[in-house]
């Protein structure tokens, strides 16, 4: 007698990738059964309560997405500010830069899934995953639960440079701290979101701020730093450029740390286990952008299940893209002073379509050629030579 499998799908982690995938699975099953109760059984495990901390995501889109209900601001122009304060504005040519409140979205999606008759939500960590031939299992709260397919979205573990299994051997941290600022007067310019502002950062690592002006009296000012230290940057020096001399107060705060890691392992972690989200390399290693890639990956997994009966037929990232990510990260480490001109060049010398696809990881060869032509060659040639040497030594 065969083993009884408790679930069709077990999703480890209820972050962006886990929740979007869970919703896509039950929605797809409902469509397949013609509106009757779906047959798919989903287990969703995460130790974190819903909506615990405020989190705002920003990304660019061309069409409607499953996250639109939680949008708090949209812009069709971006601003890039140099260290000397000079501002460059860029029209997005059909793209829309969108800010969404992920804490609100997560709370709503968690509630929707928890109320679904075919979804089991468990607030507990998964401390082990066991692969198998016909099913896999996850261990949570001291017991094993079986599923036909397991999706692991737990945070990736950085692989130290030079160790066995390190494909590229480059790891950095992206730390960020932001404040929601409310002004007394209608003093905030909402015509463009500021993607990169280098004018208020003098730290040793690459640092900048970005601004999401959601109304004439309310904006998110976020300071970002990319380096090897985990210290949180200070967003307050950048507030003055946003408030225009008006009195202001902080009405909310956000902070966090994201590893910028070039993945060293296959997404297929076993016969029945697939890495998703950041663990599956869906955050662009060289930039940290993830939302657009996770939306696309969710659709690809659902399509693989529909067409092939398994979730593994998802397109891999090209090897040349992984190589570019490693070179970009090495340049961030070694060439901090040269990286500000590089970022500015992206938005002043390359087509915006190519730049946005490059930052999200969806660029093709022609996009890459446009980006490479726009960048100052010195820092990246030196980083490429160093990366090539590291690869040869391994």
What role is predicted for each listed range?
Residues 302-394:
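C-terminal helical "tail/cap" subdomain of flavin- and related membrane-associated enzymes
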Residues 201-206, 256-275, 281, 285, ...:
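FAD-binding beta-loop-beta segment adjacent to the flavin cofactor pocket
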Residues 59-135:
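A conserved beta-strand/loop capping segment in the N-terminal third of enzymes
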Residues 24, 112-249, 260-265, 279:
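Predominantly flavin-linked oxidoreductase catalytic cores and closely associated redox partners
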């Amino acid at each position: 007698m065969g083993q009884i499998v408790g679930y069709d799908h077990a999703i480890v982690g209820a972050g962006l990738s886990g929740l979007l995938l869970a919703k896509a699975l039950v929605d797809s099953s409902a469509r397949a059964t013609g509106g009757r109760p779906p047959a798919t059984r989903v287990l969703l495990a995460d130790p974190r309560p819903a909506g615990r901390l405020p989190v705002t995501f920003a990304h660019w889109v061309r069409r409607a997405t499953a996250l639109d209900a939680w949008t708090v601001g949209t812009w069709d122009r971006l601003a890039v500010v140099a260290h000397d304060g000079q501002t460059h504005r860029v029209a997005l040519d059909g793209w829309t830069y969108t800010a969404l409140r992920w804490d609100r979205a997560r709370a709503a999606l968690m509630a929707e899934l928890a109320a679904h008759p075919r979804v089991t939500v468990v607030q507990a960590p998964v401390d082990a995953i066991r692969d198998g031939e016909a099913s896999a299992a996850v261990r949570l709260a001291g017991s094993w639960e079986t599923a036909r397919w397991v999706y692991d979205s737990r945070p990736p573990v950085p692989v130290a440079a030079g160790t066995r299994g390190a494909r590229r051997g480059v790891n950095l941290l992206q730390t960020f701290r932001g404040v929601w600022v409310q002004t007394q007067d209608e003093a905030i310019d909402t015509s463009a979101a500021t993607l990169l502002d280098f004018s208020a950062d003098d730290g040793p690592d690459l640092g900048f701020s970005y601004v999401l002006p959601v109304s004439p009296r309310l904006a998110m000012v976020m300071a970002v730093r990319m380096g090897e230290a985990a210290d949180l940057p200070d967003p307050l020096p950048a507030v003055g450029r946003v408030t225009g001399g008006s009195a202001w107060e902080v009405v909310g705060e956000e902070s966090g740390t994201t590893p910028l890691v070039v993945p060293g392992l296959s997404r297929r972690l076993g016969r029945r286990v697939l890495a998703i989200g950041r663990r599956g390399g869906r955050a662009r290693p060289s930039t940290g952008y993830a939302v657009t890639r996770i939306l696309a990956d969710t659709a690809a997994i659902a399509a693989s299940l529909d067409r092939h009966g398994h979730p593994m037929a998802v397109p891999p990232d090209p090897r040349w893209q992984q190589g570019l990510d490693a070179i970009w990260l090495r340049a961030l480490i070694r060439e901090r002073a040269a990286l500000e001109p590089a970022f500015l060049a992206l938005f002043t010398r390359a087509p915006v379509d190519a730049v946005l696809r490059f930052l999200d990881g969806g660029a093709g060869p022609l996009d890459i050629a446009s980006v490479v032509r726009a960048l100052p060659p010195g820092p990246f040639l030196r980083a490429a030579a160093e990366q090539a040497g590291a690869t040869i030594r391994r």
